[in-house]
Amino acid sequence: MPKLEMMLLVLLILPLSYFSAAGGQVVQGDWRGDGLARYLQRGDRDAQGCQVVTPGSKWGRCCLNRVCGPMCCPASHCYCIYHRGRGHGCSC
């Protein structure tokens, strides 16, 4: 089998879901998982930790970026995530 045919065969077998439209590797995970968490893993969109609003309180306001609005979390080490079907929530 010539090299060109072999290369085409390999490219057809290679799963396209591993690559984005720009040619880079996609963040792996199941398609039913939290889409916002996968979005934040790409590039420089890292989630920021919760900031305590009231001194002495365990609750804070979680600010990710313009995608996710402010919300409350049970501890300062939590961060906002989005669960498909369940909406925004905190992961601690």
Curated annotation (Swiss-Prot):
Q: Which top-rank group of organisms is this from?
A: Eukaryota
Q: What assembly does the database describe for this protein?
A: Hetero-, homo- or pseudo-homodimer (identical sequence, different post-translational modifications).
Q: What is this protein called?
A: Alpha-conotoxin-like Mi20.3
What positions belong to the pro-peptide in this record?
Answer: 25-45
4-hydroxyproline PTM sites in chain numbering: P55
Describe the function of this protein.
Alpha-conotoxins act on postsynaptic membranes, they bind to the nicotinic acetylcholine receptors (nAChR) and thus inhibit them. Through its two C-terminal domains, this homodimeric protein would bind to two nAChR allosteric sites, located outside the nAChR C-loop of the principal binding face and at the adjacent binding interface in a clockwise direction. This toxin specifically blocks mammalian neuronal nAChR of the alpha-7/CHRNA7, alpha-3-beta-2/CHRNA3-CHRNB2 and alpha-4-beta-2/CHRNA4-CHRNB2 subtypes.
Molecular function (GO) terms listed? acetylcholine receptor inhibitor activity; ion channel regulator activity; toxin activity
CC terms in the record's Gene Ontology section:
extracellular region; host cell postsynaptic membrane
Q: List the disulfide bonds.
A: C63-C72, C68-C80, C73-C90, C78-C92
Write out the entry's keywords from A to Z: Acetylcholine receptor inhibiting toxin, Disulfide bond, Hydroxylation, Ion channel impairing toxin, Neurotoxin, Postsynaptic neurotoxin, Secreted, Signal, Toxin
User: Could you give the domain comment from the record?
Assistant: The cysteine framework is XX (C-CC-C-CC-C-C-C-C).
Signal peptide region: 1-24
Record's family? Belongs to the conotoxin D superfamily.
Query: Where is it expressed, tissue-wise?
Result: Expressed by the venom duct.
Q: Where in the cell is it found?
A: Secreted
Q: Does the entry feature the keyword Signal, yes or no?
A: yes
